[in-house]
Regions:
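Helix-loop boundary elements of multi-pass alpha-helical membrane proteins
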Residues: 1-11, 71, 75-77, 366-370, ...
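Membrane-embedded multi-pass helical conduit in multi-pass membrane proteins
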Residues: 27-48, 375-457, 472-547
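Loop-to-transmembrane boundary segments
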Residues: 2-17, 95, 365-380, 461-485
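N-proximal low-complexity "stem/linker" segments adjacent to membrane-targeting elements
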Residues: 2-104
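Short hydrophobic helices that act as membrane-entry/anchoring signals
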Residues: 8-11, 15-18, 56, 60, ...
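Non-transmembrane catalytic domains and loops of membrane-associated enzymes and transporters
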Residues: 71-381, 541-547
Length: 547
């Protein structure tokens, strides 16, 4: 026991020093600006910091490839489908069409005897349509339903202590004695909804799968995730490949990259940072080891009501269990179709990322060093990028601004080209479009998320009643103002001094290259997507989900 404690302390010390050394090393390389080579008049250069980022991308891609190879090998692994499994669906003001498609896909799951519990966040007349859809799809005779005036943590004023206690028992009996259950309860947020499903199930299930009400599941999705948990008892949770059901190009290619490169790499080392809400599965025995702590999570004195899935994943990691990703398990989900809703979603996700980064750092020593390495690289990269942008925009040289834009698109094109080769689809090249969204919107949204990290809420409204929130435009406006001032400052500085002919030539060539890049990319987009690649929405489901 004493020896084990010493080893734990040594691991804590080792991972801490590794993380600090890595951050100090990267910061030093950035601040010193050491250059391996530079051209005359400093038009082009390649430094140590750039080399670090290139090596990171190469290593990340390599391990992602190795993990995909492991996934293909798992096809040969036979499993017994004899473990009990419950699917928990969280619903909140969902679009009726999305909800119906979700439930139809649930009925088509191939895992035998799966129990389905849908908990609706809200119990008013306006929410009743979701329960009606549940009964219609799952079967009027097969569905057990209950409209609860309270929830597990808030007692309705209309209930007495005795009736509240009876309601708690009734919810548990309903869930345990029926296969298809729908519960409407007092509004409390997504975490409250998930808690109800987990608590009512108790320890009666072997595995618990989570799903959002806008998600359409592949029939084999549950089987493939069970396979991962069955292969290794030290895997505590697993997530699948979340794809975008609407043909919204920028999001679909970005989702593919995030899951099949970034999370696949994390999965190779058993430390996936977030098992997504639309498609995830956990060992039920682990859930009940931290259920109360997960629900009662606080940050800066406030109860946390967002980042539920990421914190659930981190709780599994905190116990020393691995978290995995499998591309064999798939689903389709909806993404915000308007810019403001997307921005609010990204801000909410960024809040949970930075908050959970701090929590996650306490468990680095329980996992592979890659977990520490990637946390440092991805956690601090936005700050280095913002510093670089501001520095180049305020150096008083137009070429620096143009070079920054060229490098951003060059890196995006390299990453998207690799994704095209891996996926075998030229469509992935258009992921380079996403770099514009990242630089113009996601970066300032991340900073805004840090500034408002203790603000709670769902972050986005339900789909049936869309509420537009313009607060996300504040950091975007500030960011564009800073960059605009930098451009004006640079133009003024350039007019004060003689413009070298070599600089003029480089500027013209760079501008032509940048403009040509966008002309070619937009032309390809028009040809491949708008004409040749245009498909009906239903065709996207033909592969596995023609619902």
């Amino acid at each position: 026991m004493k020896c084990q404690r010493v080893l734990t302390y040594l691991r804590i010390f080792g991972t801490t020093m590794f993380g600090i050394s890595l951050l100090v090393g990267i910061s030093t390389a950035y601040i010193m600006g050491y250059q391996f080579f530079t051209t005359a008049h400093n038009h082009l250069s390649f430094g140590l910091y750039g080399a670090i980022l290139v090596v990171h991308l190469i290593i990340q891609s390599l391990f992602a490839l190795l993990e995909h190879r492991n996934m293909r090998r798992s096809l040969e692994t036979p499993i017994k489908l004899n473990k009990s499994l419950a699917l928990c669906i969280a619903a909140y003001q969902e679009d009726p069409n999305y909800l119906k498609k979700c439930l139809v896909s649930v009925k088509r799951l191939t895992y035998p005897g799966i129990k389905v519990i849908m908990v609706i966040d809200g119990n008013s007349e306006d929410d009743m349509y979701m329960m009606e859809i549940f009964k219609e799809v799952m079967g009027w005779d097969n569905s057990a339903t209950f409209v609860w005036q309270s929830n597990y943590h808030i007692k309705s004023p209309e209930e007495t202590d005795e009736s509240y206690a009876e309601s708690l028992q009734h919810v548990s009996r309903l869930v345990l004695s029926n296969r298809f259950v729908c519960i409407m309860q007092k509004w409390g947020g997504k975490r409250e909804v998930m808690y109800t499903a987990f608590k009512a199930l108790g320890r009666t299930m072997d595995y618990v799968q989570v799903c959002d009400s806008d998600t359409m599941l592949d029939p084999a999705s549950s089987v493939e995730m069970v396979k991962v948990l069955e292969e290794d008892p030290m895997v505590g949770g697993v997530g699948g490949d979340v794809q975008v059901s609407k043909l919204h190009f920028y999001f679909s290619v970005r989702y593919w990259m995030a899951f099949n490169i970034e999370r696949a790499c994390q999965s190779y080392f058993g430390c996936v940072q977030c098992i997504s809400g639309p498609l995830g599965m956990y060992r039920n025995s682990l859930l009940h080891e931290f259920l109360e702590d997960w629900y009662n999570q606080t940050f800066m004195g406030s109860h946390c009501s967002f980042g539920d899935d990421r914190h659930l994943t981190n709780r599994v990691l905190s116990l020393g269990y691995a978290t995995k990703y499998t591309a064999r398990s798939k689903c389709l989900t909806e993404t915000p179709i308007t810019y403001l809703r997307w921005l609010n979603q990204q801000t909410r996700w960024s809040k949970s990322y930075f908050r959970e980064w701090l929590y996650n750092s306490m468990w680095f020593h329980k996992h592979h060093l890659w977990m520490t390495y990637e946390a440092v690289i991805t956690g601090f990269f936005p700050f280095f990028l913002i510093a670089t942008a501001i520095q180049l925009f305020f150096q008083g040289r137009l070429w620096n601004i143009l070079l920054f834009l060229l490098i951003v698109q060059a890196v995006a094109l390299i990453k998207s080209s690799f994704a095209s080769c891996l996926r075998g689809n030229i469509v992935m090249v258009f992921m380079s479009f996403y770099s514009v969204l990242y630089m113009s919107s996601l970066l300032p949204a991340k900073m805004f998320a840090i500034a408002t990290i203790n603000k709670s809420g769902w972050g986005t409204s339900g789909r049936k009643t869309v509420v537009v929130n313009f607060i996300g435009l504040v950091p975007i406006t500030i960011w564009f103002t800073i960059l605009f001032i930098g451009i004006i400052y640079t133009i003024i500085q350039q007019t004060k001094k003689t413009f070298p002919q070599s600089e003029e030539i480089v500027l013209i060539v760079g501008a032509v290259v940048y403009a040509s890049y966008w002309v070619i990319l937009l032309t390809l987009y028009t040809v491949l997507i708008k004409k040749c690649g245009k498909r009906k929405k239903e065709a996207h489901y033909d592969m596995v989900l023609d619902v």
